[in-house]
């Protein structure tokens, strides 16, 4: 999960293949409703462990958002009953934006007909919001990838997580 005050980016990985995939974005409503919807998703997808990104500052210290994310992770574990682990998420949103731009650039280039008209302002605003949602979900997949790579490294070293 990529925790945010307005949205929570979600990703999932198959236990066998371990390939993280963006799942979507949970638009925040309130604590109770957010937990209800997360509980439903956890049940629907058979989630055995939840990974929440810890937004540390670049110097590694915990700021306000990191403290919020920690409290959120504690609530998730208590209310949903699935083990929760936190992973340093520094620069994951930046990486997600880079991946999205790279991927979107390929799609737009391939699909835009020559001489296409400019989009209306409403369409641009809608795409911008969809882009934010995509970035949050991709950031969650990047966080999950970091966690899984750390697990694999520990397994190779013979260290238990």
Each model region followed by its residue ranges:
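Two-metal-ion RNase H-like nuclease active-site motif
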Residues: 1-2
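Phosphate- and other anionic-substrate recognition elements at nucleic-acid/protein interfaces
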Residues: 5-161
């Amino acid at each position: 999960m990529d925790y945010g005050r307005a949205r929570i980016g979600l990703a999932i990985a198959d236990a066998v293949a371990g390939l993280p995939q963006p799942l979507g974005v949970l638009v925040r409503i309130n604590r109770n409703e957010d937990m209800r919807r997360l509980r439903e998703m956890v049940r629907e997808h058979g989630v055995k462990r939840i990974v929440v990104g810890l937004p540390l500052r670049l110097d590694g210290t915990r700021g306000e958002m990191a403290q919020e994310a920690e409290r959120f992770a504690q609530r998730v574990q208590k209310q949903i009953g699935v083990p929760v682990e936190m992973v340093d998420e520094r620069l994951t949103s930046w990486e997600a934006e880079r991946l999205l731009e790279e991927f979107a650039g390929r799609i737009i280039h391939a699909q835009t007909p020559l001489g296409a008209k400019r989009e209306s302002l409403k369409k641009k605003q809608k795409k911008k919001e969809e882009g934010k949602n995509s970035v949050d979900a991709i950031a969650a997949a990047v966080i999950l990838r970091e966690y899984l790579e750390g697990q694999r490294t520990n397994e190779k070293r013979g260290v238990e997580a």
